[in-house]
Regions:
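Inter-Walker segment of RecA-like/P-loop motor cores
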Residues: 5-46
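Hydrophobic "anchor" residues on beta-strands that sit immediately upstream
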Residues: 20, 53-54, 92-94
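Short basic/glycine-enriched coil/helix segment immediately N-terminal to the Walker B
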Residues: 41-52, 88
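Walker B catalytic acidic pair
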Residues: 57-58
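Residues immediately C-terminal
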Residues: 61-64, 101-102
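Flexible beta-alpha connector loops of hexameric P-loop NTPases
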Residues: 66-73
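Conserved helicase motor core of P-loop NTPases
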Residues: 77-80, 84-91, 99-183, 188
Length: 191
């Protein structure tokens, strides 16, 4: 089993929970080398693993945008992950993520967690499970209460009139907004 995550921080958190070393996606699947212009060149490694399950956490952060470039850079990070994993002998991929988290940069949706997209784009049989029991938050948590409320409103596409009452939750505090339009800066400084 190989544990992967998009960022160093998410790999470290994953390692802590699983008590097994996790790597960034880039470290596992790409070779890097300096080219003569001082930039880094990336090339896809050969997957030498056999009968290995690759678990990619925080997959909502994995981009699917392709570019007009050539070779490796005309493909998305998800393209490269799938190409790398399935090039190994009998290797499998488990994608883990939260569909309610922010999508990748320059994307409106996290397609890496979208069954239809994955099935159509990569011609793979997709099996998915959605977990609905929270285990890392206190049942009486205000954060959990509002996160659940927001998730439900997103599913129902009810984006209007979202209001929060902070009373009764010890883990929430009201912070007054600051309007920067009323702040003025001095026009000169004394030396």
């Amino acid at each position: 089993m190989i544990l992967l995550a998009p960022t160093g921080r998410s790999a470290k958190v994953l390692s802590g929970y699983c008590e097994k070393e996790a790597f960034t996606i880039h470290k596992e699947i790409f070779y890097t080398k300096n080219n003569y212009s001082g930039n880094l060149d990336f090339s896809l490694k050969v997957n030498k693993h056999k009968d290995t399950l690759f678990i990619v956490d925080e997959a909502s952060m994995i981009g699917t945008n392709r570019s007009e470039g050539v070779g490796l850079f005309s493909q998305s990070l998800l393209d490269n992950v799938i190409k790398y994993v399935y090039s190994g002998f009998k290797c499998k991929l488990l994608i883990v993520g939260d569909s309610a988290q922010l999508p990748p940069i320059k994307s409106n949706l996290s397609y890496s967690l979208n069954d239809e997209y994955l099935s159509k784009e990569y011609d793979k049989n997709i099996y998915s499970v959605e977990l609905d029991q929270v285990v890392r938050q206190d049942v009486n948590s205000g954060i959990l209460s509002y996160a659940t409320s927001i998730r439900e409103k997103i599913e129902l596409k009810e984006f209007h009139d979202i209001k929060f009452k902070l009373n009764g939750f010890s883990d929430l505090i009201r912070v007054e907004a600051v309007s920067y339009t009323h702040l003025t800066l001095p026009t000169s400084y004394a030396v």
